[in-house]
Each structure stands twice: as C-alpha cells, then as structure tokens.
Amino acid sequence: MRLTKMRFPARRMALAAATLGLVVAGSGFTAQAAEAPSSTPVPINPPDGTVMSYVVNAAQANPGQTRKVELAVTASGGVVVQSWPAIGVVIAQSDRAAFRENVKTVGKTSILSVGATRTAEVGDKITGVQLPWGPGASGWNKGKNKPVNGDEPTTLVPAGPADSQESQQWDMAQINADKAHAITDGSRSVLVGVLDSGIDPTHVDLAANISVADSVNCTQGGRPSQAAGGWYPTTSDHGTHVAGTIAGVRNGVGIVGVAPNVRMASVKVVNDDGYIYPEYAICGFMWAGQRGMDVTNNSYYIDPFEFWCDDQPDQAAVRDAVSRAVNYSVSKGVVSAAAAGNSGVDFNTNTTDSASPNDAPAPIQRTINAGCKDIPTQLPGVVTVSSITQAGQLSSFSNRGLGHIDVAAPGSRILSTTLNGKYGLKSGTSMASPHVAGVLALMKSAHPELTPAQMVAKLRADATKTPCSAAQNNSGATCDGTTELNSYYGYGVVDALKAVK
C-alpha cells in the first residue's frame, strides 16, 4: 500500500452494472490517443522456482467459467489461492516462469487476461488445499509501528484524565459534524468497512463500535480469514487512527468520530511489511459486498505501483480485477471513499512516477500517460477525497486534478485514536478520506433508502462550494476550474449537516 501513500502506501461514481454475470471485457479502459507516449515497461520475469502471485480473469463472470479458470491454473502448475466466481477472478500462486503463458494456452477462451500482482517473490505463500471459495487460515505477529505511504508519523497527544478532547477536533466543526450530531449520531444498522491495517479492539473509543462478526484478515495471499486476532493491527496504527475519525465512540473520553453510533468492521488489507497488494484489496471489496456493508474507507494506494498502466499487460489485468471487485461492491450497495494520495501531483498533468515498483530493490523513473491510474482512488465506483488544512487550503501534499477530485475534507494534523489506548495527530489524505466515509455513514443512517449513486450525488450537491485559492505553501500545480467544480476541492468541502437533512 503505501497507505496513502499509507506506507500505507486514494472515480467517478459511474456505477458498475448491477448485474455481475456479465462479459467483463466491458471493464476495459479508454484507448490512448495515437500520439500519447507509451508508459515505461516494468518487466516481471521471475526464474523458475520463484513463487509469484497472479490474477487470472475469466472472460465471463460466472461460476462455470471461473471453474474452467481454476482448472487451467492447476494444470499450469499453479495453486488456486482464492476464487471469486461472482466477478470471474481467480487469485493464483505459481513458481513456474511460464505460468502466465501456459495458463492462457490451457484456459483458451475462458481466460481474458493474466497479470502478476507484484514484482517481488511472494512471502505469504499458500501451500495447503483450499475449499472452493472458502476462507483459509491465517495468523498475525506483533511488530513495530511503521509509517505509511507518505502520511506523516503519528505525533502522540497526552490524554487528560477522562477528559473529552472534542474541543481540539477542529476538523469536526469544519465539516459541520458537530451540528449534524444534534440530529443523529448514526444508526447501529449502518456498517462501515475500514480497509486498512487493522483496528485496535481494546481502545475505549473504538471497542463498542467494532463488529467482530464482520471483521476479517485479507493479507494471507488474498484469502479471507476470520481466525481470532487476524484483523488486529500488528505493525501500524494507521487503521486505528482512521477508525477513530469515522466512528469514535461518544463516551465523554478522548475524541468523537463523524458517525459515533455506527458500527465498523476491521478489514485488514495491509501486511506486516506495510504493503497492500491487489489480491488483498480485491478480498476487501468482495468481503464488503458479501457482508452487506454500507460504506468502505480506503486510505491507501495499491502496491507495488503508485500508477497502474493499461498499456502494460500485467498492470492492466490487475486493474481489471480490482475494478471488478469495486463494481461488485457497488452492485451490493456499498459506497467507497478513498484518499487521493500524498504525492502532490495533478492527475491531469502528471507524466512521471518515481515511486514504483515499491517492492523492488529500488523503484525506477517511469514515464506514465493518461492510461495510468492511481487505484483504487481513480477507479469508477470510488469517491476521491483531497485534503485541506484547518485554514481551508489544499494541503501541500494532496493530489489534485479537475474531474478527478470529488470532495475535500480535513487531513492535516488530525487528532484521533492510536494504539494502546492513546491519541495522536496524523496528516495525509488518509486522514481526509475517513471524514467522508463518516459523512456517508451519517447520510445512510438518515436516508437508508438511498442507493450508492444517489448517495454520491447528494454528497456532491451538499458539499460547500469552495473557489480556487493558493495551496498550502503555494505547493504543486495551481487550482483549475470554477467555484462549483475545481481541481483542489472537487464539488466542495464535505458537509455532514446537509448529509443528514
């Protein structure tokens, strides 16, 4: 991941077809103009004996075609780690150098595309036999707290004895969450999936709002596991901080979240090395759809590429697989908020990527084009969130781009929950996105009849229209657009009060 860059390592809400038994070549990408430069290739050519992870995408998303893909994987020297027949995606591992070519030959017309999900050898190797489409085993290990994906390290804040720190939460006032709470704190029927590094289940400001029954670990090869403790945080407080912003409990202690009475599921998609690989995110979105979640928060980009390019076969196959999972979740009623990212670039003008692949000994300087996207934030079906400061300026680190940013939210020096019952300040678009997830949760609480498309339309319409101004420290590309829609704030700053009316 680089959590936005959460090490952890953040489009439009063009809703996916509600019917997933479709020919999924339709989740394809826009062709590049003839004069557009090709993106820099990143060859992934492991020698025999190197275990790699792959997505294998069926030409049609149905159980019969997916079963053909599974058989092709096995016949080609691969192991089926996880099957998602609802979207026609199989996660496989293989130590055969020619696996991609062989599986396409064996699978024939049943397979649309195959792509490696990483450039490095798999650490989470799957060797056991898995029941078809069922969860596997997993575990977790204690580790040191790691910073994520461009987000600043946590600055711990002393907590007073049973004191509320609401007065320090300027961010809640900025989005009118405090006023919204006079109408509702949210409904217990609303469930938010926090796709992240795990949520501390012992924190006094979180424990009451965590749904253990809906929490899961997706970091064992992309296979969902509800083994005890698997979804706990291990090497990062990132998910715990995000969770507090979404739904910190109102209890007179510490902080209060945007939607303090909704429930959250910890959907762990960040491994102990700080990576969110595609198969983990696919598992997270599929789990959210299958468990009937209403909202997900995604404060990360999917590793190992900050931008995934549709003119590179491996990257294109991965984008297709992740897109299918996002589309599936939308078809099941899920609205997903995502961090725009912390590289300070304008999506419309950026032509280089020097951070990828981040699982290699060293990243390379890549040329990218308009067909290269930051995922999941730039995928259809995802609400993209930029970050602003307490003064209302675009945060210096925030990505931007006219037609790419949906809304803006506070993301600089945000006070929230951290590990071991503590509180801390973090900055990043990772901190902005959970404000929007919380607002969406409040909206769903007040208006349970709304569909995902209607929720996104209302979120945009309700946002406080904000004209262009200088970014923090005058950093990065200047603002482009109108008061109604621009590259910094999108449709405006999210408004919790209007969301519940």
Model-derived features with residue positions:
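C-terminal region of N-terminal signal peptides and the immediate post-cleavage residues
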Residues: 24-47, 252
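Active-site alpha-helical elements of protease catalytic centers
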Residues: 188-191, 195, 224-268, 277, ...
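Secretory targeting and sorting signals
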Residues: 1-35
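Autoinhibitory propeptides
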Residues: 36, 42-43, 60-63, 67-166
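C-terminal subdomain of the subtilisin-like protease fold in secreted/lumenal serine endopeptidases
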Residues: 40-47, 81, 293-300, 447-501
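Extracellular S/T/G-rich loop segment that most often corresponds to the catalytic His/Ser-adjacent loop
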Residues: 334, 359-445, 449, 457, ...
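Substrate-binding/access-modulating region of protease and related hydrolase catalytic domains
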Residues: 187, 269-376, 419-434, 485-486
